Every structure is written in C-alpha cells, then in structure tokens.
C-alpha cells in the first residue's frame, strides 16, 4: 500500500483523526498540545497519527490535504483544519458539535493510535 493509500485508509477508518507531532500524552509541539487539549475537552474518543514517527506520512499528507502545516484534524473524512481554525471553532462552540456528531457512542477522553505501523496507545 502506498503512503497516500495509507493516509486515505486512516482518514476513512476514523471518524475523528488528528495528525500531530507526538502523541496526546506527550505532544511534541505547542500547536499539537493545544489541539489535543481542545479535543479531549470535547469528551469523545479520537484517533491520532504521530507524524514524527512516520516521515513518509509527514511528507505526503500536505500534498494529499493541500494543507502545509500540522496538526491536521479530520472529522468524518473531511479536513477541518489546523490549530488556528480548531481553536476558533472551539471558541464559537462549533467544535463540540462536530466532535459529538462524529463520535457518538465512543469512550470519553480516550485516544487511539491510527497508525498500524506503530504499537497501539493506551
């Protein structure tokens, strides 16, 4: 499977997916930390991919998404945006609605690793 196919499969397989630097327990940049905190505050399970552990995804995703920076949040297969957009949506109360609609029935405040090439997270 090509890296582009892997990315598309990850996006299609996860209702809420965050491509980030590090993981939710140990974000490796302030923007990833902020978005993780905002998602956790919404109380729905989300998947993540640590782009620092997967340089192929890190280099390919901006071409697939037409979005140059990280983190990148996908909800129901659509790119929502990066840190500034997610923060703005949160401040307007819109992020909660998006996350709730996508995450119905999921465990609260949990994250799982969507990158099958890495070991599963807690």
Language-model features and meaning:
Residues 47-48:
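Short catalytic-loop micro-motif centered on adjacent basic/acidic residues
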Residues 80-81:
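Short hydrophobic beta-strand segments in globular cytosolic domains
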Residues 1-17, 21, 25-28, 34-42, ...:
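Non-globular targeting/processing and membrane-anchoring segments
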């Amino acid at each position: 499977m090509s890296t582009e196919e892997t990315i598309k499969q990850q996006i299609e397989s996860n209702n809420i997916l965050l491509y980030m630097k590090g993981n939710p327990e140990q974000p490796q940049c302030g923007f990833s930390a902020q978005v993780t905190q905002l998602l956790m505050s919404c109380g729905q399970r989300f998947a993540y991919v640590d782009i620092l552990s997967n340089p192929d995804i890190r280099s390919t995703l901006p071409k697939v998404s037409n979005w140059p920076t990280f983190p990148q949040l996908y909800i129901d297969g659509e790119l929502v945006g990066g840190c500034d957009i997610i923060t703005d949506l949160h401040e307007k109360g819109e992020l909660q609605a998006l996350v709730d609609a996508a995450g119905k029935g999921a465990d609260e405040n949990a994250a799982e690793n969507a990158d099958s090439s890495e070991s599963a997270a807690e």
